[in-house]
Amino acid sequence: MVTTLLVFFSVWKAYTFAEAQREKIYVLDEGKSLMLALSQDLEQNRPVEAREHVRRFHELFFTLSPDKSAIEGNIQRAMFLSDRSAYAHYVDLAEQGYYNRIISGNMSQRIGIDSVRCDFNTYPYEVVTYAKLSIIREKSVTERSLVTRGRLLNSTRSDNNPHGFILEAFRVVENRDIKVYDR
């Protein structure tokens, strides 16, 4: 009786050990040694990916140089990360002559993201971005406070949208001068 229990216990333990080993992935390290590849649940990284998605959109959309093709290229890449609300904002700025003034004035615009706040308790995820814009002219620099809002929707990952989000309902809620100083 004891021997039978010991055999069944040993077989069961060996089976569970083998199952656990099958769930592990090993990677060959430059042809020399095996390393255990640690897998993570994709959902664990979602908050980090969301903030990086929003950060990347803002960098593409608000970093401008006095070059029409560079502006159009960045805006086109930003549109892969957002919906028509961002395109509508781009069209508004274009109709107001903003991009033409950047080009003709030989100005540059840089963005520095202070923080990205995402609410993951509701879906779509509410996002607020706090940033500073620097508009660099030949003789002066204008610093502006920028606050934007939007919502993130889960989307399919692609080469053009590696984080798998779409920024929707994008709007600028604050864009005011903080200071102007000479260069």
Predicted feature residues:
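Solvent-exposed, amphipathic alpha-helical segments
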Residues: 53-64
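Structured, amphipathic secondary-structure segments that form assembly/contact surfaces
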Residues: 1-25, 29-48, 69-183
